[in-house]
Amino acid sequence: MKIKVILLTFFIYISYFSPLWGQTTGKITDTKQQPIEGATIVMQLPDSTYLGAAISAADGTFTLEQEPDSYLLIIQHLLYQTRLIKGKTTDAGIITLEAKDYNLEEVVIKGEKPLVKVEDGRLGYDLSVLSEKQAVSNAYEAITKLPGVQEKNGTLSLAGANSLTIVVNGKPTTMTSEQLETLLRNTPVNRIEKAEVMYSAPPELHVRGAVINVVMKRSHDYSFQGEVSTNYQNRYFSSGGANGNFRLSTPKLTLDVMYGADNIQTMEYTELFSRHTLNDNVYEITQDEKLSSKSWMHNVRTALEYNINEKNHLNVAYTGSFTPDGHNRSIADGSFQQSSLDKFTDNKMNNITVLYSSGIGLEVGGDYTRYTSDNNQTMFTQLSDKNKSSYTLTGGQRIDRYSIYADQKHNLTNNWGIGYGVAYRYAKDYDFQTYNNVTGNIQTENTEAKLNEQTASFYFSLNKNWATGTSFSVSATGEYYTIGNYHKWAVYPQASLTYLKSPKHIFQLSLSTDKTYPGYWDMQSSVTYLNGYSELQGTPGLRPMTNYNLNGTYILKQKYIFGLFYTHTSDYFAQSPYQATDRLALIYKNTNWNYMRMIGANVILPFSIGNWYDARLTLVGMQARQKCDQFFDVPFDRKKWMFVGTLDNTFKVGKNLSLELTGNIQTPFIQGT
């Protein structure tokens, strides 16, 4: 009740005391009405007092945070004549620049768009530039081409970051990372304005740590466009799908509709060797396992953007993902046991998001996700001593997540700014599994559990921008978190400094803190059998881990990136295998360690040869230290150096045909325990 009163009071406060701060916008074009990117727009008062500056985006648009009664705009670009514009309205309109006449005889100057731009401490990438020479078909694939970003087994990582979060349009969502990945895989690249990479997310994003913010394009003209695409891949099985989308836009309204259907079939082989000691005897267990999965996934999204007026906007979006009749099969054959496991699943996800943006710097939004999962599985096992066991299991999960937030920004004099906001998130989880038809010597336990999770947070931020491009920001977020009988107050500081010696030399330093909570299913006292030897156990009382991250980055010529990083994670938890001491069983279980610490460096070097070859070399070197005093009966404290090298190559073999080849090498590293 106390949290609700605080939130209500804060909403009233920000809605009543927010002064009328606005923005001045416009668009820069050439004489052929083509947008001009990279033009510098300087705003002054009529008495020449400096107010602020901006750089035009890829579509020629610019935004200045100031809104004086009258002003003077100075527009400059290396290839165009400087122009002065006087204005009194918040819409500066379309400003046309005339090209300079250099009179260079038989000389062709080809410009290269910068790979990265720094805006308010954020590393901004134009995905259309990155995907010009890359074989990408959707927004998710374009994100994997960002410098320092790698994908492994469906998980994205950023070089030098402990973890990575993806957000859309700078706002949180109650969708999981897997559900958000599905959304981006069904989003065309041409719907994305840019991707912003931050090693220390500002508090108004309501996430912490490293973040990639995917900014969708806005349309303010009369247009209709659509796209149909198909994809095919073969990894033992043939898989593929089809996607369709269209956008209808007017100056007041934009409607986006997308639908995709994918036939997903995968195959994976694993080999296991376990030297298991039991009752002073050593058993050498070998096992080969074949894992296959087949399913159809249907994805739909409908988004509506309504421009109430020039300064006020309302966005509503619905996202659905449905995977009925999924079938997973595991067949294991080894020296200790033979087993087969069939699992049939039915998963559904529905999400709705609402966001209101006002001209006074206030944003209010909410998000709701409903997720249901049902599964039925059957397992048969025969041990080497001819003993047999079997069971059938019915299980499921029901999750409801709600979130609301409000953010307020104020632009002060001399390019100072402040921000503050609140957020509240509530989640309700219900898990169950019931064993039936149990035969043989197998331990089973029916479980049914309910969890309620609440998170309330508030923050205050301060930032400063200089005309040279240098900027800094600091913030502190207070959070109250509760789940079950666990209650915790925490404060998360954040700081970021960007120094521009010149556009060719950019330095950035960031500090962030975060807390990572275990999944709901991981905290249940359940046992799930993977085969006749391996099993998965829950961990009631699993503690969240706290992350501290320090990153330093140097960007040379807006394309070459060099970084140093340090991360320390207290109460680190990971799912690790453990050989049971009372029976022949390999137990996979999440446990808390003392800490996990990493220190290292990364280098990103893009290069090209003519118009036919484009490449990027990524090098990462780091030392990891892992310590755990209470890992069952085998405590450990170990260090290990690791080096990773990745070379991404794109060959232009035709006007509309490209070939990609990626090479990766990694030195041995610690896996599990």
Per-range role (PLM):
Residues 44-49, 72-86:
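A short, solvent-exposed loop/turn motif at the edges and junctions
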Residues 93-96, 139-142, 180-182, 196-197, ...:
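N-terminal periplasmic accessory domains that precede
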Residues 173-200, 244:
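Short acidic/polar hinge/loop motifs at secondary-structure boundaries
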Residues 47-61:
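Short, acidic Ser/Thr/Gly-rich low-complexity loop/linker segments typical of extracellular
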Residues 253, 297-323, 341-493, 498-504, ...:
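Face-selective signature of the C-terminal outer-membrane beta-barrel domain
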Residues 42-44, 76-80, 92-131, 151-153, ...:
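Short, acidic, small-residue-rich periplasmic hinge/interaction motif at the N-terminus
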Residues 397, 515-564, 568-570, 586-600, ...:
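Outer-membrane beta-barrel signature, preferentially recognizing the C-terminal barrel domain
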Residues 140-175:
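Extracytoplasmic beta-strand/coil segments of soluble accessory domains associated
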